[in-house]
Structure formats: C-alpha cells, structure tokens
C-alpha cells in the first residue's frame, strides 16, 4: 500500500471519528502520525494552525509566550486577549477563557490547533492543569490535536467518557487499552470504582490497606498514563507542607505495595520522574469496561449492538464513582463519569422511543433526571414525551417542579426549556 493511500485512510478515519470531539490524541503507538499531521495542514477541508512544542515549553508563561508568538505570525492579531491579561499570577479559568477568545479569532469556520512534538516539552504541573482547563473553554469551532511519541498525562479515560476526546491509532479508533497494551497475563486484579471502591485479587477482596489512602492512591494512579509525585501530594495532602506530604506519600505507597504484595512486582513504579501503574500487571478496571461500552454505543452501526452497549454501560454504572468519598479530585471525576451514564440512559431512551415504547423511554429519562436534576436537555425530552402521551398536566407539573428546583440551586431555566414548555402547553 502506498504512503498516499495510507494517508488517505488515516485522514478519512480522522474526519469520521473526531467530528464531535474537542480533543484528538494521535496515539503514541501510531506509525503514521506525521503523515496525518502533514495531511491536516495541507487539507482544504478546515484550516489548521500549528505549534511545535519544545523543551522551552515547561510552564504556562513559556507555553503561552511561544504559542502566541508563533500563531501571531500566521494571524497577526492572535494573542491580544492573553497578552492583555498577562501570563503570570492569573486564575487559570480566566487565562483559558482569554486564550479561547484568541483562538476564536483564528477562524469562524471549523479549525484545528495542532500541538505537535508534545513529548519534547517537560510539562510542569501548572501547564498540565492549564491544558485540562483549556479543553472546557475551547471555542466550538476549534479542535485541539495532540501529536506525541508518549502519552500526554491528561485524564484521557474521563475525557472519552464525556465525549470530549478520542484517541486514534492511525486509521483505528482506540476503544480499549487506552494507555498501553495490556500485559500478557491473567486478570488477577480487578478494580471496581463505580461504587465505594474495592480491589479483588485472585477472587478475594483486599482488606489489608491500613487505611483508605493506599487504596485511593491506586485509583488515582489509574486515572492517567502517569502522574508526578507533586500531583499526588497536591491531590491528597493540600494541608501539609511539601516535606510532610512527601513523607506521607512514601508511607502510603509502601502500604499499597504491601497490600498487593501477593502479585509479586510493585504495582506502582517510578520511571523518568513519573509514577505509573506497572505495565507488567494486567488489571481489569470497571471504568475501562464502562468507557468501552460508551464507545461501542456511539460507534455501532446497528441498533441491536447500540442497545446492548448502552445497556451494558448502564449496568456497569452501579453507583457513582467512589461513592462516599468527597476529595476534590474524586468529586470532579464523579461528575465526568456521570455524564457518560446520563448519555447511556438518554441514548437507550431514544432507542426505546424509536421502537414505539415511550413508557420505557420515559422511565429511562426519569432515571437520568433523578441522577442529575440540573441537566435540562433531559427535562426537555421528558416534557416532549409527556406531551406525546397526552399527559398535559404532567408536562406542566414537571416544568413547575424543575423551575422551583433550579431556583433553589441558584440556577435559571434555560430559554430553550421555557420556549419548549410554552410550545407544548399552547399546542
């Protein structure tokens, strides 16, 4: 097969699979990443803006300085918002909003921002956090593309669960083993985080943790391809100084290894300044199974397969992520995985409705609304179904209930929700 043909295939796959994603990762194991980047830059389908990361991009000021300099050579006005705000001592949400405003000036049409050679930069924790924040501020027409020989340490599994990101390995959509190929070994360890969080080794529940922190350290390390010690300390021990936090971290790590010593090698290894879960240990993780089901539901070509995938995702989501824990990093992830669960309920409701089973569709949507009462798109679908079933009084009652509930939460009824209600009542 010629390189041109391969380029056509990987480009077509990119267009197919990335259409609804904010972020695209060209997986490190792909052989034709550079071919695709060249094709994206040359394509007339959408405008692409390019920034090659370097060893200088170590923190937020350095990254923004380099990015605004290079992109201003492509679009002279780029960087005005960020430069006006400044790079240092600024809230990351404000800084990301300013960069997003600059990105929106690049093009009013769909466009790409390609961060190439991402592995060349020794990313500091502040830049890592900023990039995560930026994803939620990206303008609708701008898509972020990472090309790297190693996996950027973003929470890719959670991003995929929310439908914000996709991973591509050449022409293939990555649907499992998101971080590395699984070790060629039996699944001796099974990790369950959709619920209170527990670990099973060789069919037996592990209960020798010596506190909850070693167990949470394992769960935190599964979240990303790799983490720094400072990221761990910041997530777990914000009330301690650096030396105290490091000491407690090492004690916690030893307890984690002791609890799982029956597997042989240490489950958490240190490589090149980062900690990661040992790739020699094959772990069955319910979060991975859940996200795999979401991907299959999104990509399946027939309703039967879609239905089975959405149903599996719903069944896997027994309880919220690490239910009962209230650490900031946990509650943040909990909301993100809940987004995938609401999607599964809503999509299965759509299938039930298409199959002329509106009552079953309504029951699924009511479950979604109960799980997240603030998601107004679900409430709109419920009102549409009530109207379709000629349950006019319940349409009115539902709107009044959610209006009061949103008010009590300090939220407002969205104009689209109010407009739909008026249309349904007036019809």
Residue ranges and their predicted role:
Residues 1-7, 13-16, 161, 166-167, ...:
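Short boundary/linker motifs that mark transitions into or out of structured domains
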Residues 22-23, 27-30, 120-126, 132-168:
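Sensor-1/coupling segment of RecA-like P-loop NTPase cores
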Residues 23-52, 66-69:
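P-loop NTPase Walker A phosphate-binding motif
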Residues 60-81, 97-101:
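Conserved NTP-binding/hydrolysis module of P-loop NTPases
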Residues 155-158, 167, 222-224, 241-245, ...:
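Intrinsically disordered, charged and Pro/Gly-enriched terminal/linker segments
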Residues 185-187, 192, 251-281, 404-418:
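DNA-binding patch around the recognition helix
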Residues 204-236, 256, 379-382:
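Short amphipathic alpha-helical recognition elements used for nucleic-acid or partner binding
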